[in-house]
Design a protein with these regions (language model features):
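P-loop NTPase motor domains
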Residues: 3-8, 16, 20-332, 383, ...
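A broad, structure-centric signal for solvent-exposed, well-ordered loop/edge residues
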Residues: 52, 64, 271, 363, ...
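Short, intrinsically disordered/low-complexity patches at protein termini
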Residues: 368, 421-422, 430-433
């Protein structure tokens, strides 16, 4: 790409020691004080796989964090292990929320903890139902009916259980059975509980939603329940169900009241938990907004910055296009890492994707093979499309609202002295752990040596194994006098 004159972005030469900053490229260092810059701190980073989004944007952001609260979504545990000691030394409270292996983290998330009103119940149900909509061809009638049924079951659990968790709601759904009466209306094993609630308050929220379901014809009710059950099964894995029983719960107010770093680990290859993670983000934004509204100045005491790696992979965050429009006034900001604008539009739709882009005052383009994205960048930067498509590896274009585009190189994180120290200490810890594992393995007999994958697989099979009676025991269980029911069935 031909060299072009660049205009200064008014990048300050010096900042006070220990001030939060944003490093967005070689020589591109900015304050995060919105009052000074006049801009919001929302950043959209676009680059193909391997373009350096994480190492050149995310890791420098963590390096330059001293007083802001951080919510960092990662698929690579190395980042978590690498930066926890650094942030702890700076006085950060570390929260580790691992959706892949919940027991590995030090905190859990239960959506039931944030129910403060009947409106919250409805929001939770709608978020769960809509989270899987992208993977289905939904009929809004079935989704709305399933949400109404889920409203009833959540409310019933909250009203009748001591210290309820979402695991209790899931157990209620799992145990629910439906049958029909002589008039073809629905009967279930929960009818008595809802009659009891109705006797206490005929207009209570749980019974009102339950009547909507129980007055349906049995076949229609069966379809509604099937819709809900399939969504629940695809959203809440056995690992998540275990997490709901963990004692230490996440409280979003902590992010706003003290300097906190929350690391969220998801899987890059397991899409089954994506809808639940989207629910988590929706709940987090809602809780932080509500908490900010309760403050005298309408803002969070501590600014909260969300770093969302692979933001456009998985399921859309409910209402995110609305949230991002008002993040700044609550002292909340986001860094969204995506591979292309097309990817964002395919997840959120063209209108919502445009809203998200327009509410990011900073845009970092690090190269992509996506033609539509390159065309937009070509128009925005006023340079030929050919130059965009042929951008050298390691180069980038930085857009800041109110300034001309800045053409330069991505930030060389490995040349940062503090990062070199972080990396050095991390490698020492990894090497020490490796030596310990080698010692343990060397003490085992050769026939007991299995790789990690085999051990995990074997442990899982042992955990779920159910001993099945032998064929003889099945045969012996039928007496000579009794008819062979199975044989009769097959004859029919």
């Amino acid at each position: 790409m031909a060299k072009r004159k660049t205009r200064s972005l008014n990048i300050p030469a010096k900042y006070p020691d220990r001030a939060d900053r944003m490093i967005l490229g070689d020589g591109c260092i900015f304050s995060t004080d919105c009052r000074k810059t006049g801009l919001n701190n929302n950043i959209l980073v676009v680059g193909g796989s391997g373009s350096g989004k994480t190492v050149s944007i995310v890791e420098p952001f963590l390096l330059e964090s001293f007083s802001r609260s951080i919510v960092c979504s990662v698929t690579k545990r190395g980042i978590v292990n690498k930066f926890i000691p650094l942030l702890q030394n700076r006085g950060y409270k570390i929260l580790d929320l691992d959706f892949v292996h919940p027991s590995r983290g030090n905190v859990c998330f239960d959506p039931l903890d944030y129910i403060n009103s009947f409106a919250d119940i409805s929001f939770l149900s709608q978020s769960i139902i809509s989270g899987t909509r992208r993977n289905r061809n939904p009929d809004l009638y079935w989704d709305e009916s399933a949400a109404s049924l889920l409203n009833a079951l959540i409310a019933e659990t909250l009203m009748l259980k001591d210290n309820p968790t979402f695991a209790d709601v899931l157990e209620t759904i799992d145990s629910l059975s439906i049958s029909s009466r002589y008039d073809e209306l629905v009967t279930t094993d929960l009818d008595e509980k809802f009659k009891f609630l109705e006797s206490k308050d005929p207009l209570n929220y749980a019974s009102s939603n339950w009547r909507t379901f129980s007055n349906l014809p049995v076949k229609t009710a069966g379809c509604v329940f099937s819709t809900l059950h399939s969504i629940i099964d695809s959203t809440f894995t056995p690992e998540l169900r275990v997490m709901f029983r963990m004692r230490k719960r996440l409280r979003f107010e902590q992010l706003a009241n003290e300097k906190t770093a929350l690391f969220i680990t998801s899987s890059p290859v397991d899409p089954s938990i994506n809808s639940f993670i989207s629910l988590f983000y929706a709940q987090m934004f809602k809780e932080l907004f509500d908490y900010a509204e309760s403050q005298p100045d309408g803002k969070l005491p501590f600014p909260v910055h969300l770093i969302a790696d692979d933001f456009a992979i998985g399921c859309p965050v409910p209402l995110f296009d609305q949230y991002i429009s008002i993040l700044r006034e609550k002292q909340i900001s986001v860094i969204l890492l995506i591979q292309s604008e097309t990817q964002l539009a395919s997840l959120y739709g063209d209108g919502s994707a445009t809203t998200i882009r327009n509410n990011c005052d900073t845009y970092v383009y690090m190269g992509s093979n996506d033609l539509a994205t390159a065309q937009n960048i070509s128009v925005r930067a006023n340079i030929p499309l050919k130059d965009i498509l042929e951008m050298p590896i390691g180069s980038q274009i930085l857009f800041r609202h109110g300034s001309k585009p800045h053409y330069g190189q991505r930030y060389n994180t490995f040349a940062n002295a503090e990062y070199q120290n972080v990396l050095r200490e991390y490698k020492k810890r990894v090497a020490k752990e490796f030596r310990l594992r080698q010692r343990v393995r060397s003490g085992q007999k050769s026939n007991q040596k299995n790789d990690d994958a085999n051990r995990r697989h074997t442990a899982f099979l042992q955990e779920i194994f159910i001993r099945v009676p032998s064929e003889k025991s099945f045969v012996g269980s039928v007496s000579a006098e009794e008819p062979d029911l199975l044989a009769q069935l097959f004859e029919e």
